[in-house]
C-alpha cells in the first residue's frame, strides 16, 4: 500500500498480525506412531491395484468390475462374464512366499494371529473359486514391481479363454 502524499513513493506501515506461539504437538509413543501409520494403509485402490487397472485399460481389457460384491471375497478386479477374478495381494499383509517380509517386532502374537487369519481367508476363497469353476489369479506386489508386463500377459491369456484344465500356479 503506497502513501497518497505528493511523493507517493514510500510505503505505509501495514498492520501485521502478531504470530502467536504454538506449542509443539506432544510426542507420540511408539504404539501411537504405529497406530497412526497403520491407519493410513488402505484396503482399496492401493498403488499396485491402480498400476494393474491402468495397464489393463491401456491393453484394451476393459469391462472389469472393481471389488465386485457378488464374487466371493470381493476380488480387486473381476471379469464376471469370463469368470475371472484377480486378487492383488500386498506382500506384508498376505505373507508373500516370494519375498518373505519380516514380522513386526512389537506385539508379535497379535500379528501372527492376524496373518494366520488372512492366510486362512485366502485359502477359503481359493476353494470357493475352484468349486464355482472360476479362474483366480493372485498377483503379488513384489511381482508387479518386477514384471508388470508378464502379469499383464497372463491376464490377457486368461481373458481370451484358456482351457479349464490349465491351472494357475499362484
Name every feature range the model reports, one short phrase each:
Residues 2-170:
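Nucleic-acid endo/exonuclease domains
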Amino acid at each position: 500500500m503506497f502513501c497518497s502524499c505528493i511523493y507517493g513513493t514510500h510505503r505505509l506501515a501495514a498492520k501485521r498480525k502478531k504470530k502467536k506461539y504454538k506449542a509443539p504437538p506432544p510426542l507420540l509413543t511408539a504404539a501411537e506412531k504405529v497406530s497412526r501409520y497403520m491407519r493410513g494403509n488402505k484396503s482399496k485402490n492401493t498403488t499396485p491395484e491402480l498400476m494393474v487397472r491402468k495397464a489393463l485399460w491401456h491393453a484394451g481389457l476393459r469391462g472389469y468390475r472393481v471389488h465386485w460384491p457378488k464374487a466371493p471375497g470381493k476380488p480387486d478386479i473381476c471379469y464376471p462374464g469370463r469368470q475371472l477374478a484377480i486378487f492383488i495381494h500386498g506382500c506384508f499383509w498376505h505373507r508373500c512366499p516370494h519375498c518373505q517380509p519380516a514380522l513386526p517386532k512389537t506385539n508379535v502374537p497379535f500379528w501372527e494371529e492376524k496373518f494366520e487369519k488372512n492366510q486362512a481367508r485366502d485359502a477359503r476363497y481359493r476353494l470357493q473359486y475352484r468349486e464355482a469353476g472360476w479362474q483366480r489369479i493372485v498377483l503379488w506386489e513384489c511381482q508387479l514391481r518386477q514384471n508388470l508386463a508378464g502379469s499383464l500377459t497372463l491376464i490377457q491369456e486368461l481373458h481370451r479363454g484358456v482351457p479349464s484344465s490349465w491351472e494357475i500356479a499362484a
